[in-house]
Amino acid sequence: MFGSVTLNRQMGGLNAAAVESGLKLGAKVIWLPTQSARNNLEKQKGDLSKAVEVIRDGKIVPELQDIFQLIKDFDVVLGTGHLSPEEIFRVVEAARNAGVRKIVVTHPEWWMVGMSLEDQVRLVQDYDIILEHCFAQPMGGGKYKSNLPLNLEAIQACGYKNVMVSTDGGQVENPFWEAALEQYIQYLADHGISEEQIFYMTHEIQTRLLNL
C-alpha cells in the first residue's frame, strides 16, 4: 500500500510544504484538488469561495510551479483530481513543460469530470498521459453506474498502453474493489481485449508509475 497527498482545503490547498512532507514520508501520488476543485463545487452547487483554484486570469497559478518541481524531483505521479477538462489541458501542458514525467488524468469518464473521448485522445496524442478508467461512478443515493462500455471505447480509441484499469472501489456506492476488478477484467476479455493487454493495464502501468 502506498500513500498520497490530495491538495484540498484541508491540506492547505496548493501547499508545497505539505507536498514535500508527504513525499519525504513516501507518498507516490500528488492529487490536485478533488472535493475542493472549482469544477467539483460548481457541479455540486457548493460554496465557490472555498474552491482551491489552479487557474487564475487564464493562467496556471504560481503555487503549482513549486509543486511540479517537487513531483519532478521525487519522480512521483501527478493526478488531476476533479478538475474540469479545460483545467486539465492547461495543467497537463504546464506540468509537462516543468518536466513532470508521470501524469494520470483521473477518471475522465466520471460525470464530475466529464471529459469527451475526443479530448482524451488528444491528451494522449499530445502529452502521452495515462487515463485512469474506473469500474463505476457513484451517482448518489446509494447508486452507481457501470463505466465498462465507456472504458472499452476509450481503450480502443486511445490505445491500451495509455489506459489504466482502476475501480474507485473506496466509494461507498460502488462495489468492493475485488468484485469490481473481476467483473472489469472479464468484461474486457469478453470484448476482445487480449490477456497481454489486460495485464499491461492492470500491472505494468502501475509498476512504472510507482517505480516498483
Predicted segments with their positions:
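Mid-to-C-terminal alpha-helical segments outside catalytic/metal-binding sites
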Residues: 180-212
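Catalytic pocket-lining loop regions of alpha/beta-barrel enzymes
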Residues: 69, 74-146, 164
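Charged helix-capping and loop-helix junction motifs
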Residues: 16, 61, 116-120, 144-152, ...
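Extended substrate/RNA-proximal surfaces in nucleic-acid metabolism proteins
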Residues: 8-106
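Short acidic/histidine-rich active-site segments
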Residues: 160-177
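Active-site beta-loop-alpha junctions enriched in small/polar residues
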Residues: 4-10, 33-37, 83, 108-111, ...
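Divalent metal-coordination and catalytic microenvironments
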Residues: 1, 30, 78, 131, ...
